[in-house]
Amino acid sequence: HGEWKKERKQKMNQTLTRKQFDILSILAEEKGTLSQRQLGEKSGHSLGTVNRVMQELTELQYVTEGEITGAGISALEPYRAKRAIFIAAGFGSRLVPITFNTPKPLVRVHGQRIIDGLIDACLDAGINEIYIVRGYLAEQFDQLLYKYPMIRFLENPVYNEANNISSAMVARYMLSNAYVFEADLLISNPKIITKYHYTSDFLAIKKDRTDDWCFIVKDGVIVEEKVGGLDCWQMVGISYWNEEDGHKLSDDIKMTYEQPGGKERYWEQVPLVFCKKHYKVEVRECQENDIIEIDTFRELKAIDKTYDV
């Protein structure tokens, strides 16, 4: 009887354990049956764990004969990414001369605008609510509406005198169940943008050493952000914020922004540095070649020869 009560309570709350989430989200993404061995490989869990979790999910009626059910899809709903915010307001000073007349996210690489790859990855993950925070040469972003009529624009009038926290200020009520992107990342593996997230997370690349912004990670959770480090995780400007954290961020961003020196902050310093007691942000691994950051005109010429004239 106790078991039944526990199961009923879990169903009412619709909270999944981490392992249940891992297996269920794989089944939802794969659109077919997978052997338990395949589930183990994809989830990183042992065969024994997969077997036990599949039994739990079957009892909860989230899985039938190895396939996810309608109830299983519903159970994943609180974990689904519902919107995406693109921070695209800045002047890409290091990419001059190109950025004198084109905002960096609209620069074309091999004929495609940088931001298009990110937007396409969102659409593939079922994320159709898309906001772009714009500032520098704002009207140029209108061209995106021909291809992506669902886009909504948020205006950042102070992009020139403040850091990207000013863009987060403009978008601060849209941060629940939301991806936040730096809009100038060239994505080469769209699969890293996933539909379901168990908790808030930040993409990063495991590094022996880096001179870049990086995270110190303990038990999968980011405990420190700094510039340069050994045995750390190099930050990639793509993060996801669950519903609860999104609500907290709307207050914390405003509070940080309004403090002395607040306008000079990077937006992610709010949850990772200044208000880090309020958050537990996990690191989500991606590989070196999943994302290409083009920081300088020289790097752009190396990637796309048409600029090398």
Indicate residue ranges for each PLM-predicted region.
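Short, Lys/Arg-enriched N-terminal segments with co-localized hydrophobic residues
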Residues: 1-11
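Short amphipathic alpha-helical interface segments
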Residues: 13-42
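N-terminal glycine-rich phosphate-binding loop and ensuing alpha1 helix
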Residues: 24-27, 74-134, 138
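Short amphipathic alpha-helical interaction segments
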Residues: 44-56
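A short, conserved structural fragment
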Residues: 58-67
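Conserved beta-loop-beta/alpha segment of the NTase-like Rossmann-fold superfamily
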Residues: 141-213
